[in-house]
């Protein structure tokens, strides 16, 4: 009888393959009326019959077939069935009850698919009845174990192999895992350097399994120019600027090359150059080299160099160790008064750091989430000018801690809040610092409403809150407020700063246009709109 049942099903499906796709009309036999009533329609006969059996119609039979009309006798709907225990379940009893066989079958199929058996099949074998309840046995045929034998790139064939292995976590020879492969698209979307033309596909051959990826290299280089208007310490009108250049994935190694130049209203100049290579020799080890130069007018010049080796935990985060070399030279040797505040020194140190970043799908947004934590141990050798003797050599130990984090929250469609916290501290036993080793904050990138790098401190903290109304992906207007505290042991200053302002950002053919207006105050001063700062710039992608 069962053999005849499958013959009928096969015959019906064969007819459908050569004809126009039609819907089957299923009629159910009613024991009370002794007649058939129309039950439902479906285009796939076999899947319909399988579904009915899975939900509990285990005695289902086909009474007759007339064209597209299928006359069924569903039989009894078994709410509870007893499944025979075997190596698949490993329970204590010979049989165990269930009222959701479909979920069991789905779970078994999913587990095997993610363990290298994508073609695993489960056979339901009836084992009779007990107390009017169905007893069955599930027999699992796993098939052959599948492993990833190769990755084929279609489109961007020079995609870095280290990124494939450690960024996308695809390793040749690993066991096939469908759940893991389904996350590849979301992983690709976490970088700005590539896009996905279509979803990954898997080619199953008799003796091999090949994964096909469809990446596309995108333009990800940036030029960002910001021009600021304000006044210097004498109240005179001054221009200041900030130029950023970012070259990304130029050599197809997912590398980042950045240059940042800042010129302030007080004739200070800083240059920051960095090179980041995330997958050295196709490994999960990366390198980040940083060179910084700061010159305060003609008074002194600082040079900082650091080399950071990091381990890529995943696409979003890494942990690293750094080597640090710093030096500073006082340029006005004939100025004895200034020489007491500025020391020649050299520093060497090591540090630990952790970095986490998740991009936001909107191009206007800096990112969705960011966290950077660092701890450095530094040994400083300095040459101090003394009124009693010309040079006084001194060696001290210092510790540096830093934190910067932000998070973008979507309060409601089109309404976003960005919260930012930044902290940095340079610590030493005697709290004795040189003027030329202090942090310099202020301006568009830190606390808005003040001149670029016009505030010095050995410890500071900044908390910012931005509200943004984003009607579409290409435009937003916002309000912001910044609060900061500074501690300057050198000048014996401990105070707080406050600023607020508004800004606008939108996409143009040239790039992203930014315009902001901010005004700030200290504990000793009030808001003076004559001292307000205006910044505008264009972030161009090429």
Residue ranges and their predicted role:
Residues 224-265, 270-294, 306-308, 503:
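Predominantly transmembrane beta-strands of Gram-negative outer membrane beta-barrel pores used
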